[in-house]
Amino acid sequence: MNNLLLVALGGSIGAVFRYLISIFMIQVFGSSFPFGTLLVNVLGSFLMGVIYALGQMSHISPEFKALIGIGLLGALTTFSTFSNETLLLLQEGDWLKATLNVVLNLSLCLFMVYLGQQLVFSRI
């Protein structure tokens, strides 16, 4: 039950961070491209890489993984919003932005998970 509460706590924090980051990005860049979703996915992917690598080296507790890895990062990042925003761009006929959204999210997120892992593993 302890881990369930940690996931819930981390999830509530991650959801609030995602909301605030998305609002900030809209204020800075406007709403013509989903920069907020891209940023939270890229940031969350980097942090997930760090958490994974630390977990591989047994430097973090299962409780920390529940709080941060599952809760906070699970709520911070969002595949469903990414999918919906991409579909909306397609429905608006903006194939270029839709394609850019898919390519940037997938390539940057994969790279950031790798970068996070390498950052930790190189410090061993």
Curated annotation (Swiss-Prot):
Keyword Electron transport tagged: no
Topological relation to the membrane, as annotated: Multi-pass membrane protein
Residues the record lists as binding Na(+): 74, 77
UniProt note on regulation of activity: Na(+) is not transported, but it plays an essential structural role and its presence is essential for fluoride channel function.
Gene name tied to this protein: fluC
Native organism: Shewanella baltica (strain OS155 / ATCC BAA-1091)
Catalytic activity of the protein: fluoride(in) = fluoride(out)
Entry GO terms, CC: plasma membrane
Role: Fluoride-specific ion channel. Important for reducing fluoride concentration in the cell, thus reducing its toxicity.
Localization annotation: Cell inner membrane
Top-level taxonomy: Bacteria, Pseudomonadati, Pseudomonadota, Gammaproteobacteria, Alteromonadales
Name of the protein in question: Fluoride-specific ion channel FluC
Record-annotated membrane-spanning stretches: 4-24, 35-55, 60-80, 102-122
One Pfam family, short name: CRCB
Annotated GO biological process: cellular detoxification of fluoride
GO MF assignments: fluoride channel activity; metal ion binding
Keywords assigned by UniProt, alphabetized: Cell inner membrane, Cell membrane, Ion channel, Ion transport, Membrane, Metal-binding, Sodium, Transmembrane, Transmembrane helix, Transport
Protein family: Belongs to the fluoride channel Fluc/FEX (TC 1.A.43) family.
Superkingdom as given in the UniProt entry: Bacteria
